[in-house]
């Protein structure tokens, strides 16, 4: 008899606990995870570091330390890892908005783009229509016309691909530098490995 009651009570208890966890966002546990932030990025070259003449350079900018604003308030790892499945982390955008993203090379790219000047105007972005939706469609857009938060969305696996379709006409070996400017004055800088155009 006791074993039968136990078999009923344990699954019922687990079920009720899951209901509480799934609905936890509505009761304020997740109310402070509206925003996200990061302070470090890397440049990931998607094709090899040697670019053939018929190919475009393709790369990603990836956040290395994305943080959501309320994680410090939750002391229990079990609760934190469980409600993370349901809470919509960072849905309201960056806590400290971005004001500018600049991509440059350490070498002369062509006559219009000498070393350490912006290459933004020759970069095309393959981006989701809505980076916050998993089933969103991709499209191509000029770098300078894309909102900053779409370039670095709250989930880094949704980050777009960046294309430099033009070939350099000056130096053949380049290191890209990405500078990300925040509204609080912080600047995040990342540099790629050497890239060589054949």
Predicted segments, located by residue:
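Bacterial Sec-dependent N-terminal signal peptides
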Residues: 1-35
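Non-catalytic macromolecular-recognition regions in eukaryotic signaling proteins
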Residues: 25-198
């Amino acid at each position: 008899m006791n074993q039968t009651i136990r078999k009923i009570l344990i699954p019922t208890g687990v079920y009720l606990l899951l209901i509480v966890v799934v609905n936890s966002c509505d009761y304020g546990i997740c109310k402070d995870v509206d925003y996200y932030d990061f302070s470090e990025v890397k440049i990931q070259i998607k094709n090899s570091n040697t670019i053939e003449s018929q190919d475009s350079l393709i790369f990603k900018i990836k956040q290395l330390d994305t943080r959501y604003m309320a994680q410090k308030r939750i002391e229990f790892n079990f609760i934190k890892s469980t409600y993370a499945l349901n809470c919509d982390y960072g849905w309201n955008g960056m806590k400290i908005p971005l004001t500018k993203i600049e991509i440059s090379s350490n070498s002369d790219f062509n006559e219009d783009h000498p070393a350490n000047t912006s290459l933004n105007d020759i970069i095309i972005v393959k981006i989701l229509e809505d980076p916050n939706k998993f089933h969103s469609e991709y499209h191509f857009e000029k770098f300078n016309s894309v909102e900053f938060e779409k370039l670095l969305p709250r989930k880094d696996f949704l980050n777009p691909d960046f294309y430099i379709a033009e070939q350099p006409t000056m130096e053949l070996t380049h290191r890209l530098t990405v500078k990300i400017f925040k509204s609080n004055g912080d600047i995040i800088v990342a540099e790629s490995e050497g890239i060589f155009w054949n």
